[in-house]
Amino acid sequence: MRTLNVDLGERSYPIYIGENLLGDAQWFAPHIVGRRVAVISNETVAPLYLETLLGALEGREVTRVVLPDGEAYKQWETLQSIFDALLQDRHDRKTTLIALGGGVIGDMAGFAAACYQRGVNFIQVPTTLLSQVDSSVGGKTGINHPLGKNMIGAFYQPQAVVIDTASLKTLPARELSAGLAEVIKYGFICDEPFITWLEEHMDALLALEPAAVTEAIERSCAAKARVVGADERESGVRATLNLGHTFGHAIETQQGYGVWLHGEAVGAGTVMALEMSHRLGWLSAAERDRGIRLLRRAGLPVVPPADMTAEDFMEHMAVDKKVLDGRLRLVLLQGLGNAVVTGDFPREILDATLRTDYRALADQLGDE
């Protein structure tokens, strides 16, 4: 078992990483202040892991809230059903919410915790690779709006993050690949040696070899903890964590939430960020191609949806949290391992990026 710390002063909290942590009370008890707990999960995860978690909560009064599964349900009506359950069972300010599931559950349970009686404690128990390495750490919570992803929410930190790597054994291959998009991101934005490590261990990660998986999760969480500790509310360096996300969120919104998994959209969006960085002269063709090959080896799409036009992208990218004073800012790379957030680029470079033939680009790289 490994422990990391997100250093935010009095709001600091631990990240526990290990196998079979879910049923062990020692990882939960120090972070629960009252006797009332509400576990928020979904119809896919609850049958697999809820009873195990309840074993760690023995002796407490537990409300179970099981929601529909999927990005399409990350919206106001579902959030309201969490509040309904809390109020019906008379939960008070000493209640602790526990988010048992992937990124959708973590985001919604965290937002519910931020809002309920103006704030109650919550614990993240992420069960997908994507949520383990990204969304469970850092306090971003919220829901989607039909016009834009994650546009309604709050920064609200958990009391702890409990990562049980055993939960990945039931994760579909497509979800595993989606999570690897966020793992790869950390190498691209701030840790070039991690890219080399991922190239050497990608087969082991796809096979869920425990040592490789634990190492990838720990390095990813450590990178995110450093960034969040330096910039909790995304006023500066934290925005670099959104590499590929502006393009990716446009894909998710245009295609319909849940049609593309978040990590899949980020994968294709990262290819677009690599291409734009290359067009600006910040990334060599060899570096761009190296990045695309790694994403493809992870089983991720490296071509945006064929039915999305440049105009579609621009329409959806205009509704993005990184737009300031009407100016679109993007996360781009000035070399692998060095991300920047900038709105200082020629419009024609962005337009050319959106009109690139990514199918031809992928085909010219050949098969692995």
From Swiss-Prot:
Q: How is the cofactor bound?
A: Binds 1 divalent metal cation per subunit. Can use either Co(2+) or Zn(2+).
| Keywords associated with the record | Amino-acid biosynthesis, Aromatic amino acid biosynthesis, Cobalt, Cytoplasm, Lyase, Metal-binding, NAD, Nucleotide-binding, Zinc
What residues does NAD(+) bind to? 69-74, 103-107, 127-128, 140, 149
Mainly localized where?
Answer: cytoplasm
**What terms describe the molecular function in GO for this protein?**
3-dehydroquinate synthase activity; metal ion binding; nucleotide binding
> Under which pathway is this protein filed?
Metabolic intermediate biosynthesis; chorismate biosynthesis; chorismate from D-erythrose 4-phosphate and phosphoenolpyruvate: step 2/7
The Gene Ontology CC terms held by the record are: cytoplasm
Entries under InterPro entries matching the protein? Dehydroquinate_synthase, DHQ_synth_AroB, DHQ_synth_fam, DHQS/DOIS_N, DHQS_C
What is this protein's function per UniProt?
Catalyzes the conversion of 3-deoxy-D-arabino-heptulosonate 7-phosphate (DAHP) to dehydroquinate (DHQ).
Which family is this protein grouped under? Belongs to the sugar phosphate cyclases superfamily. Dehydroquinate synthase family.
Give the protein name, as stated in the record.
Answer: 3-dehydroquinate synthase
Gene name, Swiss-Prot/TrEMBL: aroB
